[in-house]
């Protein structure tokens, strides 16, 4: 079974490669393929990293307040 780190790396690599890059100075912005909204690759990478609990590996991501808190004890 693949480790969480290798799965995370593969997902992030796939997302980075799926971004259509444009030349600097072009009036267009980078867009995720198949979408019309102008979003840079950083937001998609940060969302994925924060969801997987790996946001600390990317200094440009701010995952504060995005973590789901799971308690190991049951409420009585």
Curated annotation (Swiss-Prot):
It is found in: Secreted. The keyword Flavoprotein does not apply. Disulfide bonds join 46-61, 50-63. The modification Asparagine amide is found at residue 64. Keywords: Acetylcholine receptor inhibiting toxin, Amidation, Disulfide bond, Ion channel impairing toxin, Neurotoxin, Postsynaptic neurotoxin, Potassium channel impairing toxin, Secreted, Signal, Toxin, Voltage-gated potassium channel impairing toxin. Highly inhibits both nicotinic acetylcholine receptors (neuronal (alpha-3/beta-4) and muscular (alpha-1/beta-1/epsilon/delta) subtypes) and the voltage-gated potassium channel Kv1.6/KCNA6 subtype. This is Alpha/kappa-conotoxin-like pl14.1.
């Amino acid at each position: 079974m693949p480790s969480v780190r290798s799965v995370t790396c593969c997902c992030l690599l796939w997302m980075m490669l799926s971004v259509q890059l444009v030349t600097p100075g072009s009036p267009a912005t980078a867009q995720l393929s198949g979408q019309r909204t102008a979003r840079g690759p950083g937001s998609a990478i940060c969302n994925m990293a924060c969801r997987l609990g790996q946001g600390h590996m990317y200094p440009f991501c701010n995952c504060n307040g995005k973590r789901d808190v799971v308690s190991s004890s049951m409420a009585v």
